[in-house]
Amino acid sequence: GDEIKIEVTFEKHLENKILKALFKSHAYEEVAYEIYELQNQHQNIGLGMIGELKNPMSEKEFLLFTKEKMECGGIRHSNFTGKEIKKVAVLGGAGSFAIKNAIQAGADAYLTADLKYHQFYEAENKLLLADIGHFESERYTKNYIVEYLRKKILNFAVILSEENSNPVKYL
């Protein structure tokens, strides 16, 4: 019969699932396949940011500073590593998928939101992992978006909402 060639681009973490599906659908034939890994040519483009503090802080000082500046009702965090905080990774919103990226980048701390219980173990002795709250982690983003739009679209009125839409309350 005729051979069919199918090409697919997928994220690395899906490789096993895709191969299982491929083998399952070709159970009676030997499957010819090749995998080419694509390397990101633009390492500075993506979600989140990483930077360094001018003055390193203890982990407790850093969390208290973050709580004040981000106006958090509370911060859930991993065990202290005993290291000073200098290099910080930040990803607004639900950022659990990037814990490994923050570790690989050599961050001392990773600020994000919506972490689940077991995800705090991923940081163990590697970095300080802090869940500062979804709304809190994104609260200032709108200011930067408005500033950017006002510079780029001069003939358009950009109005910043003052509405606080955080459904999460703290006691």
Functional labels for PLM-detected ranges:
Residues 1-171:
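Hydrophobic structural segments
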